[in-house]
């Protein structure tokens, strides 16, 4: 069987087959994924870098102020909290912006996966910036609604796993609304919980291990800034060069940009897990017809 047939979407696969097909597509079409998504991935990286730099520099001040007030005065002054309210609001807004930017960037990837599901191939994007607005919007809506639905299920985390299948099904089938997809697809996803668990567990493990390496420079600078700021607040000299803050920001941009592409197997393997479940459903329906 040639490689193109091996990475077709709707084909019954074991969890190993899903991971293998996902990795083949990830490697063979990486240039296409990169060309289609680099702009949105860069926007996400810039927002994430701003968040990382802000938290490394400003959040220690808030923590130390609260700790000192609790120790000395057995209470927290409202005035001190109000003075840092702007920082907290900025962090919250940056987190929301990062989530939205990531969802929009995912939309560019799902647009290519949608093309692959229909044609069995992914064409090279004609330009460096040619986004699919409809797919971006659908992905943003789907990921935000999935996040909303998954919050109550975090108490019983295993029940949240089929939502990944529901999300991919919703994005790949534009004719169906999210809530209708959730009603019809959640039970089917639960029926394949074991294979979904293995696919996502191994994929997340790969991302965690790779991400530790990719994000290591940013994490080192984050901790260095954090400890330096904590030291200043208790009377120590800063001991950091003046270029440390811009260097931290630039490092976060580069690491976040690379980390976005490290995380792509999560989307691609989920895409193939969805295709395998759909293929099994069609196979079961065909068997039922043959028995009649």
Question: Language model features by range: what are they?
Answer:
Residues 11-46, 126-151, 163-211, 248:
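Interfacial aromatic "cap" segments that immediately flank transmembrane helices
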Residues 36-59, 86-103, 138-161, 198-227, ...:
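Hydrophobic alpha-helical transmembrane segments in multi-pass membrane proteins
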């Amino acid at each position: 069987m040639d490689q193109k047939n091996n990475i077709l979407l709707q084909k019954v696969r074991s969890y190993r087959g899903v991971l293998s097909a996902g990795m083949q597509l990830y490697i063979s079409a990486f240039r296409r994924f990169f060309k289609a998504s680099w702009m949105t991935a860069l926007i996400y990286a810039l927002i994430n870098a701003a968040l990382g730099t802000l938290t490394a520099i400003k959040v220690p001040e808030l923590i130390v102020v609260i700790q000192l007030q609790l120790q000395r005065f057995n209470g927290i002054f409202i005035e001190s909290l109000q003075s840092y309210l702007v920082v907290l609001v900025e962090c919250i807004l940056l987190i929301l912006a990062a989530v939205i930017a990531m969802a929009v960037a995912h939309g560019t990837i799902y647009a290519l996966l949608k093309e692959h599901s229909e044609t069995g191939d992914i064409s090279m994007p004609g330009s460096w910036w040619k986004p699919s607005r409809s797919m971006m919007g659908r992905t943003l809506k789907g990921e935000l609604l999935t996040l909303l639905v998954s919050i109550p299920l975090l108490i019983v985390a295993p029940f949240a796993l089929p939502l990944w299948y529901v999300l991919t099904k919703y994005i790949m089938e534009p004719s169906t609304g999210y809530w209708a997809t959730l009603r019809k697809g959640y039970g089917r996803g639960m029926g394949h919980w074991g294979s979904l668990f293995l696919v996502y567990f191994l994929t997340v493990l790969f991302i965690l291990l790779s991400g530790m390496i990719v994000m290591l420079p940013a994490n080192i600078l984050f901790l260095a800034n954090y400890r330096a700021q904590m030291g200043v607040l208790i009377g120590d000299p800063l001991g950091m060069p003046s270029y440390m803050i811009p260097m931290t920001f630039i490092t976060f941009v580069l690491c976040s940009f690379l980390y976005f592409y490290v995380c792509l197997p999560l989307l691609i393997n989920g895409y193939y897990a969805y295709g395998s479940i759909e293929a099994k459903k069609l196979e079961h329906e065909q068997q039922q017809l043959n028995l009649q």
